[in-house]
């Protein structure tokens, strides 16, 4: 029987400006506090999920002076009892208040600089937050498993069926936005279903499935960005390098772009925790040490070598890097 991972963390709680309480864990370095990594979990998850990854990241980051913070967001679990909450009834735009409160908590703990790391739907949220607020305390973004919910659902049920379901959800939402869609589709309110699966919604920040999409959120970000995906992510509808290439081409204002594929890892990075920990530590170390500059490198499969970097707008004319799979 596998022993549960022992994680040296403190249990904490914060309150958002609109009165929502969020539980979480933090693991802090003993000495100098260089920056904080705030991990934003995915759809319906909780702060305590993925304990092997919490242990891997905290034990790697803390000796480097990086604090590790992971909180529930108001979309944790499936549904709450006192009022309509949880993933089924979450409003994506309210994630801004959650992340703002998380950053404020880290600042009160003595961290003046923050890297936001979002996994799955958490990646949508941190990108949306950074593009909308341009919070100067945020010095970098890590997008982990940044898969479009729309692309993933089209892969699962087909584009025609998804369009039919969206049309029905629109009819339900006109009567009552909080009414549930058919149970076979999952446990969602009509409003939440449309937020997840209707193209052009605020949550649709990874529109690689749509030719000529604007990518407004990613193109509005100016801090260093890393996109990390598992080579066996079950929600991918294309090769991992193609996905990374789409992000690279649209991170037009980011100071730098790093794309990494973790070999053998699935969407939750199970079994790839060590490689992911190495990759994240390397990216965060560069960002913290140099502020916004990242050394040139190449796309890697795994976290032990130098990450692939595309320079920001200020230096792109002098040097560009392209993976062999990226179209010219």
Walk through the language-model features, giving the residues of each:
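Short, surface-exposed "cap/lid" segments of acyl-processing enzymes
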Residues: 31-73
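Alpha/beta-hydrolase active-site loop
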Residues: 86-108
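Primarily recognizes the serine-hydrolase "nucleophile elbow" in alpha/beta-hydrolase
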Residues: 105-168, 200
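Catalytic histidine-centered segment of alpha/beta-hydrolase-like enzymes
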Residues: 265-274
